[in-house]
């Protein structure tokens, strides 16, 4: 973790607060249909249709309909996954702004277009497979908060891509000049103090989680990762050890931390990671979280940092994705999904550290 010299010199603030509510959405398999259509060399259209008999509002964030460069699809070539070079957003599903939702009447559809070359290197050209599946939080009828989550699996596309044309598509993530100087500019004053405290909490969480993963209660590990395989437990412990080391490295490390929204993708989010550049960005909502929680599974500053560092392959490879948020949704994942889900690690770390 590389931070500014002014940040290193400051002492962290400490605090206690009650846990925030976490996601307890019921999940179902019907109500929304998602279709993918190729509309250009690297451009794709997504169409979502409300198949229910009532009005429904779906969350756009972290889905195919998010205007931010989040992972919308999975791209593969010759059986190998193409690395994702966009961002991973972390948000509080219970406090989303109105613009996070799109409302659909029964039978109505919504469309979104995006360029897959903005977040993946497709310059090799040739045949690529494009797929999308996951869960979308929804509000059934009138309401202000999601009432359930609907699983979907879109059709798989096979696209013959011109590599030269794809290479000319601009990346969705702009280059930042003098990145360490930007860090000096964003992590100052109270931001610096709070971040230092968050990093210390992160280190504590990760150290305790590493111990619990390698030699702790097997049932507790099973609760979050759906397996008790000893080799898997050791691998999870190694990820936590790497996170603990990164959280303890104030003037060195593999990531760069920004305390303000240098890329402009914070709308509705608490924090986000740019894994391809090893950048972690705190949003304004991050600073409103309690610095430290002593009970429960809600997010505090250290919890969010653990979550974000699991996304960074420079800390531990491969980096994780966001299959689900919160205890109830994460509990529905299978073993493979759980081991690749950022919030599963934060929840496990919080549980073994606080409870």
Swiss-Prot record:
**Cofactor(s) recorded in Swiss-Prot or TrEMBL:** Zn(2+)
Gene responsible for this protein: MEP6
For this protein, the record's SMART domains field holds: Aspzincin_M35
GO MF, one annotated term: metalloendopeptidase activity
Decide whether keyword Disulfide bond is in the record: yes
Q: What is its EC number?
A: 3.4.24.39
The UniProt catalytic activity note for this protein reads:
Preferential cleavage of bonds with hydrophobic residues in P1'. Also 3-Asn-|-Gln-4 and 8-Gly-|-Ser-9 bonds in insulin B chain
Query: Propeptide residues, per UniProt?
Result: 20-179
How far does the signal peptide extend, from start to end residue? 1-19
**Keyword field:** Cleavage on pair of basic residues, Disulfide bond, Hydrolase, Metal-binding, Metalloprotease, Protease, Secreted, Signal, Virulence, Zinc, Zymogen
From the Swiss-Prot or TrEMBL record, give the protein name: Neutral protease 2 homolog MEP6
SUPFAM superfamilies (alphabetical): Metalloproteases ('zincins'), catalytic domain
Which leading EC class covers this enzyme? hydrolase
């Amino acid at each position: 973790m590389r931070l500014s010299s002014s940040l290193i010199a400051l002492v962290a603030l400490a605090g206690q607060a009650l846990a925030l509510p976490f996601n307890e959405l019921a999940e179902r398999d019907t109500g929304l249909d998602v279709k993918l259509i190729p509309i250009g060399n690297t451009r794709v259209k997504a169409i979502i249709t409300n198949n229910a008999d009532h009005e429904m509002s779906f969350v756009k964030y972290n889905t195919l309909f998010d205007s931010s460069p989040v992972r919308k699809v999975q791209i593969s070539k010759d059986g190998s996954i193409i690395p994702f070079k966009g961002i991973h957003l972390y948000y509080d599903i219970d406090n989303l702004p109105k613009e996070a939702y799109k409302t659909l009447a029964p039978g109505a559809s919504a469309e979104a277009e995006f360029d897959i070359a903005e977040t993946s290197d497709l310059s090799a050209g040739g045949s690529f497979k494009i797929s999308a599946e996951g869960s979308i939080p929804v509000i059934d009828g009138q309401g202000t908060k999601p009432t359930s989550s609907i699983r979907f699996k879109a059709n798989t596309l096979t696209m013959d891509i011109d590599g030269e044309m794809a290479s000319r598509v601009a990346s969705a993530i702009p280059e930042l000049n003098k990145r360490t100087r930007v860090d000096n500019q964003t992590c100052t004053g109270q931001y610096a103090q709070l971040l230092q405290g968050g990093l210390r909490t992160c280190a504590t969480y990760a150290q305790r989680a590493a111990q619990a993963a390698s030699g702790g209660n097997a049932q507790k590990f099973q609760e979050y990762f759906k397996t008790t395989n000893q080799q898997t437990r050791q691998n999870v412990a190694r990820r936590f050890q790497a996170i603990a080391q990164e959280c303890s490295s104030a003037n060195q490390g593999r990531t760069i931390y920004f305390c303000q929204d240098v890329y402009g993708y914070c709308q509705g989010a608490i924090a986000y990671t740019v894994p391809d550049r090893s950048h972690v960005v705190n949003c304004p909502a991050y600073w409103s979280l309690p610095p430290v929680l002593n009970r429960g599974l809600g997010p505090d500053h250290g919890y969010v940092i653990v979550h974000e560092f699991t996304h960074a392959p420079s800390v531990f490879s491969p980096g994780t994705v966001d299959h689900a948020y919160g205890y109830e949704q994460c509990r529905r994942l299978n073993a493979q999904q759980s081991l690749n889900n950022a919030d599963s690690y934060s929840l496990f770390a919080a549980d073994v550290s606080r409870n």
